[in-house]
Amino acid sequence: MSTSAEDVRGSAVRAKAAAALLAPRSRAEKDRALLAMADALIARSAEILAANAEDLAAARAAGTAGAMVDRLTLTPARLAGMADGLRQVAALEDPVGEVVRGRVLPNGMELRQIRVPLGVVGIIYEARPNVTVDAAGLCLKSGNAALLRGSASAVRSNTALVAVLRGAAVASGLPADAVQLVPGMDHDAVKHLMRLRGLVDVLIPRGGAGLIRAVVEESTVPVIETGVGNCHVYVDAEADLDQALAITVNAKTQRVSVCNSAETLLVHAGVAGEFLPRVLAALHDAGVTVHGDETVCAVDPRVLPATDDDWAAEYLSLDMAVAVVDSLDDAVAHIRRWGSGHTEAIVTRSLPASRRFITTCDSAAVMVNASTRFTDGERFGMGAEIGISTQKLHARGPMGLPELTSTTWVGVGDGHLVT
């Protein structure tokens, strides 16, 4: 039975009302709720793990791939990590009310731009139940109501988690409807959610390229794109090749299933003769299947010929595309054609080369002599993130608490009139 538009709209109406109640709450009130949520996850872990066990049994019965089953799995240690995440969010500064800029006008009127909550944040995501807790915590701390739509494979886990979070919110004096699951697990529920412009203030899809593309193309609610990562490492003619080798292997293999893992290596022709044999051997030793252009294939018989699909791929696996380029500008042209605007890295000892790369790469993050894996809210010192935006409006790069706010202009006068 398909989910009705009225059911989804009803949840959004309740979320809108909860957002209005949540917006003026103090940091102390919100932090108290976050800490209560963390404690409740541990206190009620048995029922959460029991619900998760049902999801896991259903996933295995359906023949779900092992990697997906792992993402779906909750353990006492993972629950403890989720609880710690909420405590860390509680320790972060509250962005609401922060003065972004301010001045006194010539007429004596005080003008300030301050941060305010977005309102109702809808998050559409795939199999990871931890996103339910992470998203709810970040939304609550930034004064927003969270309307959560996880995957059908995690419905029992997410239902149990949200019940625990809502109970802790109410016990702390906050509205229960500040955290809700979108009713229904069919595609109609998502379609209805995407049509609720005016009730839902923003949608944030987290998942694969297909999910993100569908939401961007079909939603009338404003969308922040996150996460698709075809990240590049460019080894310049003036690179420290030992450093380039270490950065390439780290960027590709440290954790392959994340959006800031490098998928393509570009090597300047001036150092290709020396560097390619070393890096190809290191990648093969790490279990990486290399897909290369003609020059790369000629160096190592284990290299597979690359196609356009490889240059465009977000592998999220032990695969890497490798090409030789004649110049920095050719590397940037390749990135602009095939990249996703996530993170690019240059390895070079040349300051002019690094500056040119920074100013010509059109990406959310650019690393100089560092791994692409650094693009992350925690590693940037921002705290937890709700995703990494690859678009240019409203936020770009890791999205922490400030990126879950908008701004209001406040003018303070003393009987000031316009003449």
Swiss-Prot record:
One of its GO terms (biological process) is L-proline biosynthetic process. Its main location: cytoplasm. Pathway: Amino-acid biosynthesis; L-proline biosynthesis; L-glutamate 5-semialdehyde from L-glutamate: step 2/2. Coiled coil: none annotated. It holds the Pfam family Aldedh. It is an enzyme of class 1 (oxidoreductase). Its EC number is 1.2.1.41. GO terms for molecular function: glutamate-5-semialdehyde dehydrogenase activity; NADP binding. It catalyses: L-glutamate 5-semialdehyde + phosphate + NADP(+) = L-glutamyl 5-phosphate + NADPH + H(+). InterPro entries: Ald_DH/histidinol_DH, Ald_DH_C, Ald_DH_N, Aldehyde_DH_dom, G-glutamylP_reductase_CS, Glu-5-SA_DH, GPR_dom. Belongs to the gamma-glutamyl phosphate reductase family. Catalyzes the NADPH-dependent reduction of L-glutamate 5-phosphate into L-glutamate 5-semialdehyde and phosphate. The product spontaneously undergoes cyclization to form 1-pyrroline-5-carboxylate. This is Gamma-glutamyl phosphate reductase. It comes from Frankia casuarinae (strain DSM 45818 / CECT 9043 / HFP020203 / CcI3). The lineage of its organism: Bacteria, Bacillati, Actinomycetota, Actinomycetes, Frankiales.
